[in-house]
């Protein structure tokens, strides 16, 4: 029923209204956008055909409680007119409405709720955090390395405080240096880097005149000639290529040493024996020749033997006179070692020319080095002499300048000393003159003071003498005059005391008059009248009397600003208040309209008491209060009213406040009047 009505309503508009029905289903409570895109049962879309003239047909009932609704008549689809290609006009006609073919029904898919996102686990979050932290750290470290190559201050901070920062910066700098200078890097890479470690030289390292052999070390001094010959032959065959290669290399390097003007330092080769002087440089060669085993003398061949040449004479070791340079000594030592090896191997004929050439070249190199040393020493001596002469000349000039400056300084100091002496002498003379003038003035003042003292003393003595003579002449009349003057002074004191008494009495009388004036103004008034002027006059007359000031300050300001009620007004107002209090005393706590009416009637019919009635009821208290008011006793009347409870006291609160104001004013006036009486009694 509901689907039929929805389908009939959908035919009226272009958009289906299934979204409204979707809210009525319990299983499809989702958003409007999701619901509007769903397909419902029996929702097959029909081709839309424009029918402007056909009126819309509404269902019989749109209420949800209708039993059934007849389906609307399906609209007829008009055939689409086609135009033949031959009759195609030049201007195309207006486009007709698009005919949508019917869509096949699809199964209804219930709406799927969005799956909630799973929360990431702790390890996954930790992994993401560590990964991001690592990436950020790498980026920051790379940025720090790059910026440290630009800024020197940041370079110092980065290499000092960041771990592995110095290694990274040095690695990048080495790469940059190798990229800029590839040739230098290729030449430097062959040399070992100076790591600062201590180099240990083995005891048997370095070049030696002995040929290294793999046999027994003492085989050459052995008595067995056969074993020595075999060992020597094996050693020569093994070491011959190395010795020849070293000799060729040294021979090739000799011309280079000659062509250079300065001797380049050679890397030190640790040797076992150090050469101290040229005399000892040839000692290893001689020792080696002496230590060699004695060879058989040459014997001429017999007639029946083949002819043979005598062996060549051994090569003499090199001796360079005056070879003090350590490089030349090392070369001589090296060449002598080579000669020793050649002589030992009987290769004299083969290497004699080369060794001779090497000797000549080494002698030339030594001579050139000596010449260069002599030349450098001569130039150095000349430069030293020139420097010494320059230093002597500069020292002489400096001494002369210092002497002239000292002389000028001494003259200036002498001149300043003389000027200072003159100034000090002048100042001391002025001080002496000033001291003398002051002493003279002091002496004159002392003399004048002495003269004045003597004059005063003489005048006193003269006065005493005159007084004595006058007293003697007048028989003591001067003493009587003194007594009269003292009596007159006593009379003056007595007169001043009586004047104070009179003033105090006058002020007391004025205070009495002011109090009576305030009281009269309050009693004569027929309605409340302010009495600010009277209080101001009373305060001025009291002349800052603390008692009067305290009494005036105890009065409520509203009392003297607006005035207080008279006795007649208080009695009249009490009668009205008493009537209301009697009515309220007859009412219960939750009184209604009837209770109020009955209380009003009963208050009229009640008998009133008279005099000082006994009892604590409301009527007795009101009767006593009225009696006290008629007698003029406001204090007791206020006490009686203050004893009421409940609504009776609430209704009489305003009247009680007025009575308290009147009592406060009366009490203050009584206190002021009592103070005035006490002052008058003190004067008596």
Swiss-Prot record:
UniProt region (Disordered), positions on chain: 62-102, 189-224, 287-317
Primary location: mitochondrion
Residues exposed to the Mitochondrial matrix side: 42-125
Organelle transit peptide: 1-41
Record-linked Pfam families: Mitofilin (PF09731)
GO biological process per UniProt: cristae formation
Compositionally biased region (Low complexity): 75-89
Mitochondrial intermembrane membrane side: 149-684
Membrane topology, as annotated: Single-pass membrane protein
Coiled-coil annotated spans: 434-464
GO CC terms of this entry: MICOS complex
Membrane-spanning intervals of the chain: 126-148
Subunit composition and interactions: Component of the mitochondrial contact site and cristae organizing system (MICOS) complex.
Protein name, UniProt field: MICOS complex subunit MIC60
Organism of provenance: Sordaria macrospora (strain ATCC MYA-333 / DSM 997 / K(L3346) / K-hell)
Organism taxonomic ancestry: Eukaryota, Fungi, Dikarya, Ascomycota, Pezizomycotina
Gene encoding the protein: MIC60
């Amino acid at each position: 029923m509901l689907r039929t009505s929805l389908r009939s309503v959908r035919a009226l508009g272009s958009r289906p209204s299934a979204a409204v029905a979707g809210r009525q289903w319990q299983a499809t409570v989702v958003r409007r956008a999701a619901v509007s895109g769903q397909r419902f049962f029996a929702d097959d879309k029909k081709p839309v055909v424009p029918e402007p003239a056909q009126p819309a047909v509404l269902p019989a009932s749109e209420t949800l409680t209708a039993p059934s609704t007849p389906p609307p008549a399906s609209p007829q689809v008009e055939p689409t007119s086609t135009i033949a290609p031959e009759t195609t006009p030049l201007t195309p006609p207006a486009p007709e409405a698009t005919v949508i073919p019917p869509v096949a029904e699809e199964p209804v898919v219930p709406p799927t709720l969005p799956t909630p996102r799973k929360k990431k686990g702790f390890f996954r979050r930790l992994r993401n955090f560590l990964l991001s932290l690592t990436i950020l750290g790498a980026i920051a470290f790379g940025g720090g390395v790059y910026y440290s190559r630009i800024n020197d201050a940041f370079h110092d901070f980065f290499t000092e405080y960041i771990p592995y920062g110095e290694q990274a910066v040095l690695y990048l700098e080495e790469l940059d240096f190798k990229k800029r200078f590839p040739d230098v890097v290729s030449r430097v890479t062959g040399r070992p880097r100076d790591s600062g470690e201590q180099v240990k030289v083995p005891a048997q390292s370095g070049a030696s005149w002995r040929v290294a052999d793999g046999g027994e070390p003492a085989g050459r001094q052995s008595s067995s000639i056969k074993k020595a010959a075999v060992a020597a032959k094996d050693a020569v065959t093994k070491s011959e290529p190395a010795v020849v290669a070293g000799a060729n290399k040294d021979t090739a390097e000799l011309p280079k040493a000659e062509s250079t003007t300065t001797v380049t330092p050679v890397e030190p080769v640790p040797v076992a024996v150090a050469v101290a002087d040229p005399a000892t440089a040839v000692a290893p060669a001689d020792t080696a020749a002496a230590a060699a085993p004695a060879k058989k003398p040459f014997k001429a061949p017999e007639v029946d033997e083949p002819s043979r040449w005598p062996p060549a004479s051994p090569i003499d070791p090199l001796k360079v006179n005056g070879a003090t340079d350590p490089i030349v000594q090392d070369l001589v030592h090296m060449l002598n070692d080579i000669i020793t090896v050649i002589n030992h191997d009987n290769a004299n004929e083969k290497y004699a020319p080369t060794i001779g050439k090497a000797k000549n070249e080494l002698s030339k190199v030594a001579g050139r080095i000596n010449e260069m040393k002599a030349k450098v020493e001569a130039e150095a001596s000349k430069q030293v002499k020139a420097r010494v002469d320059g230093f002597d000349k500069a020292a002489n000039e400096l001494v002369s300048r210092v002497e002239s400056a000292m002389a000028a300084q001494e003259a200036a100091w002498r001149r300043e000393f003389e000027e200072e002496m003159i100034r000090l002498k002048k100042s001391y003379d002025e001080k002496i003159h000033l001291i003398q003038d002051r002493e003279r003035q002091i002496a004159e003042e002392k003399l004048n003071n002495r003269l004045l003292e003597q004059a005063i003393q003489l005048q006193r003595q003269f006065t005493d003498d005159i007084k004595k003579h006058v007293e003697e002449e007048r028989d003591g009349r001067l003493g009587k005059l003194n007594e009269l003057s003292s009596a007159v002074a006593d009379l003056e004191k007595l007169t001043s005391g009586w004047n104070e008494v009179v003033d105090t009495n006058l002020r007391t009388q004025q205070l009495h008059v002011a109090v009576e004036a305030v009281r009269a103004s309050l009693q004569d008034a027929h309605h409340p009248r302010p009495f600010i002027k009277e209080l101001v006059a009373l305060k001025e007359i009291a002349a800052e009397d603390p008692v009067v000031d305290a009494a005036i300050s105890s009065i409520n300001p509203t009392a003297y600003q607006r005035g207080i009620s008279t006795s007649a007004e208080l009695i009249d107002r009490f009668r009205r208040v008493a009537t209301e209090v009697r009515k309220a005393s007859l009412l219960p706590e939750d009184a209604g309209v009837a209770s109020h009416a009955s209380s009003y009637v009963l208050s009229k019919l009640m008998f009133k008491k008279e005099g000082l009635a006994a009892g604590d009821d409301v009527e007795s208290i009101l009767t006593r209060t009225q009696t006290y008011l008629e007698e003029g006793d406001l204090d007791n009347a206020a006490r009686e009213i203050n004893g009421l409870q409940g609504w009776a006291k609430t209704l009489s609160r305003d009247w009680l406040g007025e009575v308290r104001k009147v009592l406060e004013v009366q009490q203050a006036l009584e206190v002021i009047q009592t103070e005035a009486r006490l002052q008058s009694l003190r004067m008596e």
